[in-house]
């Protein structure tokens, strides 16, 4: 049953990539190290996945969304529509270069950590960065010596601080 009033404690969610699931590498990592991070499997196109996310977070404010690749695109789109509900975004090689994405008219004010791999050929930093800068007012960028999967950079992030 959903709460009668939106929650005020931060609630963290992991949004997986297009070809991944909650049981992928990052999902398993969260299950082991931060089991309170909520996740589910998303299916369909961007709008269908956003509708699934809307259902998942119904009645919850103070959201921390960590999204990988297409999940990062989902997090950015959700934040553009509901910026008042966002505490923080952690965008991991987000697919902001996909044609489905347009920066919001008013940049999202919540803190955003954008982590990209310098060797990412799926979501190259030179294509993602301009859209990120147009989308987020409080943006921190980390470009790591990594590829799209961010297997080295991902576990090295300060997750205890990011998830509070």
Please give the residue ranges for each predicted region.
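A conserved short beta-strand
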Residues: 84-97
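Short beta-strand/loop motif that positions the catalytic acidic residue
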Residues: 108, 113-116, 120
């Amino acid at each position: 049953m959903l709460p009668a009033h939106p929650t005020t404690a931060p609630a963290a969610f992991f949004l997986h990539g297009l070809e991944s699931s909650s049981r992928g590498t990052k999902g398993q990592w969260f299950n082991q190290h931060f089991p309170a991070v909520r996740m589910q499997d998303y299916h369909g196109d961007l709008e269908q996945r956003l509708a699934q996310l809307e259902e998942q977070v119904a009645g919850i404010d103070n959201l921390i969304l960590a999204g990988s690749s297409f999940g990062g695109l989902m997090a950015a789109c959700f934040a553009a529509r509901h910026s008042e509900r966002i505490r923080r975004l952690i965008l991991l090689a987000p697919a902001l270069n996909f044609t489905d994405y347009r920066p919001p008219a008013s940049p999202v004010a919540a803190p955003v950590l954008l982590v990209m791999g310098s060797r990412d050929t799926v979501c190259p930093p030179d294509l993602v960065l301009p859209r990120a800068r147009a989308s987020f007012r409080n943006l921190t960028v980390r470009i790591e010596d990594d590829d799209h999967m961010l297997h080295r950079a991902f576990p090295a992030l300060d997750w205890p601080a990011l998830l509070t």
